[in-house]
From Swiss-Prot:
Family recorded in the similarity comment: Belongs to the UPF0270 family.
UniProt-recorded name of the protein: UPF0270 protein YPO0179/y3960/YP_0178
InterPro entries given in the database record: UPF0270, YehU-like_sf
Entries under Pfam families matching the protein: UPF0270
Length: 78
């Protein structure tokens, strides 16, 4: 289930974004980027709609994923 990021308390959203970035451990190439920059990138993706907050009832977890991946996963389950 998609959770509208606008309905999440700002401090909670900040914590979710930071935890996601730390968990992902994404390599940004030659130039290391700060945690703040990485969090800002993910926030921009949420705001633009490229990424969505997804609640898994099965696992009782929340995740951030590309909108296209969420739709593809939902279609596969139907």
């Amino acid at each position: 289930m998609i959770i509208p990021w606008q309905q999440v308390d700002s401090e909670t959203l900040d914590n979710l974004l930071e935890a996601f970035v730390l968990r992902e451990g994404t390599d940004y190439g030659e130039h290391e980027r700060s945690l703040t920059e990485k969090v800002a990138d993910v926030r921009r993706q949420l705001v633009s709609g490229e990424a969505v907050l997804v609640w898994s009832e099965l696992h009782e977890t929340i995740n951030i994923m590309p909108r296209g991946s969420f739709r593809a996963g939902a279609e596969e389950q139907q």
